[in-house]
Protein backbone atom coordinates (compact mmCIF):
# COMPACT_ATOMS: atom_id res chain seq x y z
CA UNK A 1 0.00 0.00 0.00
CA UNK A 2 1.32 3.37 -0.90
CA UNK A 3 0.95 6.30 1.44
CA UNK A 4 0.19 9.68 -0.08
CA UNK A 5 -0.23 13.14 1.32
CA UNK A 6 -3.14 15.20 0.06
CA UNK A 7 -3.38 18.94 0.46
CA UNK A 8 -6.80 20.51 0.73
CA UNK A 9 -7.54 24.20 0.60
CA UNK A 10 -10.38 25.65 2.60
CA UNK A 11 -11.58 29.16 1.77
CA UNK A 12 -12.85 30.95 4.85
CA UNK A 13 -14.40 34.42 5.01
CA UNK A 14 -12.08 37.04 6.35
CA UNK A 15 -12.87 38.32 9.80
CA UNK A 16 -11.51 41.75 8.90
CA UNK A 17 -14.01 42.36 6.11
CA UNK A 18 -16.69 44.98 6.48
CA UNK A 19 -19.99 43.65 7.89
CA UNK A 20 -21.97 45.10 4.98
CA UNK A 21 -19.78 43.43 2.36
CA UNK A 22 -20.59 40.06 0.84
CA UNK A 23 -20.04 36.94 2.92
CA UNK A 24 -17.13 35.86 0.74
CA UNK A 25 -13.99 37.98 0.93
CA UNK A 26 -12.33 39.32 -2.16
CA UNK A 27 -9.02 37.73 -1.17
CA UNK A 28 -9.60 34.29 0.40
CA UNK A 29 -7.13 33.05 2.96
CA UNK A 30 -6.10 29.47 2.17
CA UNK A 31 -5.95 26.99 5.01
CA UNK A 32 -4.15 23.73 4.20
CA UNK A 33 -4.59 20.43 5.97
CA UNK A 34 -2.32 17.49 5.24
CA UNK A 35 -4.29 14.26 4.90
CA UNK A 36 -2.60 10.88 4.97
CA UNK A 37 -4.47 8.19 3.09
CA UNK A 38 -3.70 4.73 1.93
CA UNK A 39 -4.49 3.82 -1.63
CA UNK A 40 -5.00 0.47 -3.17
CA UNK A 41 -2.89 0.23 -6.33
CA UNK A 42 -5.52 -1.99 -7.96
CA UNK A 43 -8.45 0.38 -7.59
CA UNK A 44 -8.59 3.94 -8.82
CA UNK A 45 -10.34 5.26 -5.74
CA UNK A 46 -8.48 5.97 -2.54
CA UNK A 47 -9.63 4.78 0.85
CA UNK A 48 -8.67 5.81 4.32
CA UNK A 49 -7.97 2.89 6.63
CA UNK A 50 -6.83 2.74 10.22
CA UNK A 51 -5.75 -0.63 11.50
CA UNK A 52 -5.33 -1.07 15.24
CA UNK A 53 -4.45 -4.25 17.06
CA UNK A 54 -6.61 -5.15 20.04
CA UNK A 55 -5.13 -4.23 23.39
CA UNK A 56 -5.09 -7.84 24.52
CA UNK A 57 -3.67 -9.17 21.23
CA UNK A 58 -1.47 -12.20 21.61
CA UNK A 59 1.77 -12.20 19.71
CA UNK A 60 1.73 -15.17 17.37
CA UNK A 61 4.23 -16.44 14.84
CA UNK A 62 3.68 -15.50 11.20
CA UNK A 63 2.71 -19.08 10.31
CA UNK A 64 -0.07 -19.10 12.95
CA UNK A 65 -1.40 -15.72 11.81
CA UNK A 66 -1.55 -16.90 8.19
CA UNK A 67 -3.32 -20.10 9.21
CA UNK A 68 -5.82 -18.14 11.31
CA UNK A 69 -6.49 -15.76 8.43
CA UNK A 70 -7.10 -18.68 6.08
CA UNK A 71 -9.42 -20.42 8.55
CA UNK A 72 -11.46 -17.29 9.18
CA UNK A 73 -12.01 -16.98 5.43
CA UNK A 74 -13.63 -20.42 5.07
CA UNK A 75 -17.29 -20.80 4.19
CA UNK A 76 -19.50 -22.91 6.45
CA UNK A 77 -19.45 -25.79 3.98
CA UNK A 78 -15.65 -25.66 3.76
CA UNK A 79 -15.41 -25.56 7.57
CA UNK A 80 -17.65 -28.63 7.84
CA UNK A 81 -15.48 -30.52 5.35
CA UNK A 82 -12.36 -29.45 7.27
CA UNK A 83 -13.82 -30.73 10.56
CA UNK A 84 -14.74 -34.06 8.96
CA UNK A 85 -11.26 -34.41 7.47
CA UNK A 86 -9.55 -33.56 10.78
CA UNK A 87 -11.73 -36.03 12.67
CA UNK A 88 -10.78 -38.75 10.20
CA UNK A 89 -7.09 -37.77 10.12
CA UNK A 90 -6.69 -37.48 13.91
CA UNK A 91 -9.06 -40.32 14.81
CA UNK A 92 -11.32 -38.25 17.06
CA UNK A 93 -15.01 -37.43 16.98
CA UNK A 94 -17.12 -34.54 18.20
CA UNK A 95 -18.94 -36.94 20.55
CA UNK A 96 -15.72 -37.47 22.50
CA UNK A 97 -15.83 -33.81 23.54
CA UNK A 98 -19.46 -33.92 24.70
CA UNK A 99 -20.10 -33.28 28.40
CA UNK A 100 -22.02 -36.57 28.56
CA UNK A 101 -18.74 -38.43 28.20
CA UNK A 102 -18.19 -38.57 31.93
CA UNK A 103 -14.88 -39.32 33.53
CA UNK A 104 -14.63 -41.34 36.74
CA UNK A 105 -14.76 -39.08 39.75
CA UNK A 106 -11.49 -38.69 41.66
CA UNK A 107 -11.34 -40.98 44.66
CA UNK A 108 -14.04 -43.31 43.32
CA UNK A 109 -12.98 -46.91 42.79
CA UNK A 110 -12.67 -47.82 39.13
CA UNK A 111 -14.48 -51.15 39.52
CA UNK A 112 -17.51 -49.69 41.32
CA UNK A 113 -20.87 -50.38 39.68
CA UNK A 114 -22.16 -47.39 37.75
CA UNK A 115 -25.02 -45.59 39.42
CA UNK A 116 -28.43 -46.26 37.94
CA UNK A 117 -29.61 -43.10 36.26
CA UNK A 118 -33.06 -41.98 37.20
CA UNK A 119 -35.39 -41.53 34.25
CA UNK A 120 -36.25 -37.87 33.64
CA UNK A 121 -38.47 -38.07 30.54
CA UNK A 122 -41.70 -40.00 30.40
CA UNK A 123 -44.35 -40.87 27.80
CA UNK A 124 -48.06 -40.82 28.61
CA UNK A 125 -49.97 -43.52 26.74
CA UNK A 126 -53.74 -43.95 26.58
CA UNK A 127 -54.43 -47.68 26.68
CA UNK A 128 -58.22 -47.92 26.75
CA UNK A 129 -61.28 -45.67 26.73
CA UNK A 130 -64.68 -47.10 27.68
CA UNK A 131 -67.48 -46.09 25.31
CA UNK A 132 -69.39 -44.30 28.09
CA UNK A 133 -66.35 -42.04 28.86
CA UNK A 134 -65.38 -41.05 25.30
CA UNK A 135 -66.68 -37.48 25.43
CA UNK A 136 -65.05 -36.66 28.77
CA UNK A 137 -61.74 -38.22 27.63
CA UNK A 138 -61.83 -36.18 24.39
CA UNK A 139 -62.32 -33.04 26.50
CA UNK A 140 -59.41 -34.02 28.74
CA UNK A 141 -57.18 -34.73 25.70
CA UNK A 142 -58.02 -31.31 24.23
CA UNK A 143 -57.28 -29.66 27.59
CA UNK A 144 -53.88 -31.38 27.81
CA UNK A 145 -52.85 -30.76 24.20
CA UNK A 146 -53.46 -28.23 21.47
CA UNK A 147 -55.43 -30.73 19.39
CA UNK A 148 -58.73 -29.87 17.78
CA UNK A 149 -61.92 -31.85 18.26
CA UNK A 150 -61.38 -34.04 15.19
CA UNK A 151 -57.74 -34.81 16.05
CA UNK A 152 -58.60 -35.63 19.69
CA UNK A 153 -61.39 -37.97 18.54
CA UNK A 154 -59.03 -39.73 16.08
CA UNK A 155 -56.42 -40.09 18.83
CA UNK A 156 -58.69 -42.07 21.14
CA UNK A 157 -60.09 -44.32 18.39
CA UNK A 158 -56.98 -46.38 17.60
CA UNK A 159 -55.65 -47.28 21.02
CA UNK A 160 -53.14 -47.67 22.58
CA UNK A 161 -51.50 -44.38 21.54
CA UNK A 162 -49.02 -42.02 23.10
CA UNK A 163 -50.56 -38.72 24.12
CA UNK A 164 -47.42 -36.97 25.34
CA UNK A 165 -43.78 -37.87 24.80
CA UNK A 166 -40.66 -36.79 26.69
CA UNK A 167 -42.41 -34.92 29.50
CA UNK A 168 -41.30 -34.56 33.11
CA UNK A 169 -42.52 -36.92 35.80
CA UNK A 170 -44.80 -34.27 37.33
CA UNK A 171 -46.41 -33.46 33.96
CA UNK A 172 -46.87 -37.16 33.21
CA UNK A 173 -48.50 -37.81 36.60
CA UNK A 174 -50.78 -34.78 36.16
CA UNK A 175 -51.88 -35.91 32.68
CA UNK A 176 -52.48 -39.45 33.94
CA UNK A 177 -54.65 -38.17 36.80
CA UNK A 178 -56.77 -35.98 34.50
CA UNK A 179 -57.30 -38.77 31.97
CA UNK A 180 -58.13 -41.36 34.64
CA UNK A 181 -60.61 -38.93 36.21
CA UNK A 182 -62.24 -38.69 32.76
CA UNK A 183 -62.49 -42.50 32.63
CA UNK A 184 -59.50 -43.60 30.50
CA UNK A 185 -56.96 -46.27 31.38
CA UNK A 186 -53.52 -44.64 31.13
CA UNK A 187 -49.95 -45.82 31.55
CA UNK A 188 -46.70 -43.91 31.97
CA UNK A 189 -43.73 -45.34 30.12
From Swiss-Prot:
GO terms for biological process: translation. NCBIfam families: L12 (TIGR00855). Component of the chloroplast large ribosomal subunit (LSU). Mature 70S chloroplast ribosomes of higher plants consist of a small (30S) and a large (50S) subunit. The 30S small subunit contains 1 molecule of ribosomal RNA (16S rRNA) and 24 different proteins. The 50S large subunit contains 3 rRNA molecules (23S, 5S and 4.5S rRNA) and 33 different proteins. Residues 1-56 form a transit peptide. PANTHER family: 39S RIBOSOMAL PROTEIN L12 (PTHR45987), LARGE RIBOSOMAL SUBUNIT PROTEIN BL12CX-RELATED (PTHR45987:SF26). It comes from Spinacia oleracea (Spinach). This is Large ribosomal subunit protein bL12c. Residues 165-183 have a biased composition (Basic and acidic residues). The keyword Transferase does not apply. Component of the chloroplast ribosome (chloro-ribosome), a dedicated translation machinery responsible for the synthesis of chloroplast genome-encoded proteins, including proteins of the transcription and translation machinery and components of the photosynthetic apparatus. Belongs to the bacterial ribosomal protein bL12 family. Residues 11-24 have a biased composition (Polar residues). It is found in: Plastid, Chloroplast. It holds the Pfam family Ribosomal_L12_N. GO terms for molecular function: mRNA binding; structural constituent of ribosome. Residues 1-30, 165-189 are annotated as: Disordered. It comes from the Eukaryota. The lineage of its organism: Eukaryota, Viridiplantae, Streptophyta, Embryophyta, Tracheophyta. GO terms for cellular component: chloroplast; ribonucleoprotein complex; ribosome. Its main location: plastid.
Amino acid sequence: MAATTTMATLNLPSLTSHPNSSTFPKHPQPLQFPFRTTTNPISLSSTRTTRLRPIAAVEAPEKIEQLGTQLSGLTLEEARVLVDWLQDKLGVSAASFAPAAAVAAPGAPADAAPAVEEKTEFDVSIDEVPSNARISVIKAVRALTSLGLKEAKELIEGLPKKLKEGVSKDDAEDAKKQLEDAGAKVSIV
